[in-house]
Amino acid sequence: MIKQRTLKNVVRATGVGVHTGEKVYLTLRPAPPNTGIIFCRTDLDPVVQIPARVNYIGDTSLSTCLTKGDVRIATVEHLLSALAGVGVDNLYIDLTSPELPIMDGSAGPFVFLIQSAGIEEQNAPKEFIRIKQRVKIEEADKSVMVEPYNGFKISFGIDFDHPLFNEHNQNATLDFSSTSYVKEVSRARTFGFLSDYEFIRKNNLALGASLDNALVLDEYKILNQDGLRYPDEFVKHKILDVIGDLYLLGRSLIGSFSGVKSGHTLNSQLLKKLLATKSAWEIVTFKDPSELPFAYTPVAMTA
């Protein structure tokens, strides 16, 4: 039987929210089988818990935000991406702010935290959501789609009119049967343009942004002294975001995702349309490990 997984130990980190600029204390705690991923606002009395599920998605203009009543938790996608990438099913995530810490702008520090805590199997079957038919959303020149595939594959294309983007690949297809999430995706950082910075600051956004937690570009070049971590870091970060958004389905996806110039808003619309199209998916478990798509085998996920 392919089993659910949680952390072996409690692990903590501190950082700042990229939009609020506030200091955030983050604690990851093991959770029982069938709990799922639960965010807990421990700065509130009583504590408010928000499940990482599609029906709690709120604002998606700059990041993926979860809401419950008037309580919100912003920028959940990087941590969710890390949890999906290493295969954690059940977890309590305590935080003392309405936004997760941005860390270095990638999922790498979260992967390190998870690996530091250790992962343990639980005595309950892991559920997957398997795509049975294509579901697509198009909006002008943007599109997102999921379709059947016996594994986990993401294709993504971006299109920025900037000298640096023209030099680097703006399209990528990653099949996770042969691609290591940890090595080849998790360290891709979020990026932004200096030309947008003034507008963003005027609107009291990105108060915690810096060259330590984002790739920043002027009209011609990257301002970060260390340069790119991957030649295709820009499009890989978009893939990292997609993996986090997809994990709001509450289960690992068996299927293929394709996106063109999409962001969190279009991603969330696709998730809602998918779940509403009952004939397009099914929940599956695997008694026989040999039937599991290779992308989800322990060998592939820990590489």
Curated annotation (Swiss-Prot):
Cofactors demanded by this protein: Zn(2+)
GO cellular component, one term: membrane
Keyword Cytoplasm assigned: no
Enzyme class per UniProt: hydrolase
EC number in record: 3.5.1.108
Active site location: H264
Pathway entry: Glycolipid biosynthesis; lipid IV(A) biosynthesis; lipid IV(A) from (3R)-3-hydroxytetradecanoyl-[acyl-carrier-protein] and UDP-N-acetyl-alpha-D-glucosamine: step 2/6
Alphabetical list of InterPro entries matching this protein: Ribosomal_Su5_D2-typ_SF, UDP-acyl_GlcNac_deAcase, UDP-acyl_GlcNac_deAcase_C, UDP-acyl_N-AcGlcN_deAcase_N
Keyword Lipid metabolism included in the entry's annotation: yes
Pfam families documented for this protein: LpxC
Catalytic activity field: a UDP-3-O-[(3R)-3-hydroxyacyl]-N-acetyl-alpha-D-glucosamine + H2O = a UDP-3-O-[(3R)-3-hydroxyacyl]-alpha-D-glucosamine + acetate
Binding site for Zn(2+): H78, H237, D241
Keywords, comma-separated and alphabetical: Hydrolase, Lipid A biosynthesis, Lipid biosynthesis, Lipid metabolism, Metal-binding, Zinc
A Gene Ontology BP annotation from the UniProt entry: lipid A biosynthetic process
GO molecular function, one term: UDP-3-O-acyl-N-acetylglucosamine deacetylase activity
Function: Catalyzes the hydrolysis of UDP-3-O-myristoyl-N-acetylglucosamine to form UDP-3-O-myristoylglucosamine and acetate, the committed step in lipid A biosynthesis.
Family stated for the protein in its record: Belongs to the LpxC family.
Stated name of the protein: UDP-3-O-acyl-N-acetylglucosamine deacetylase
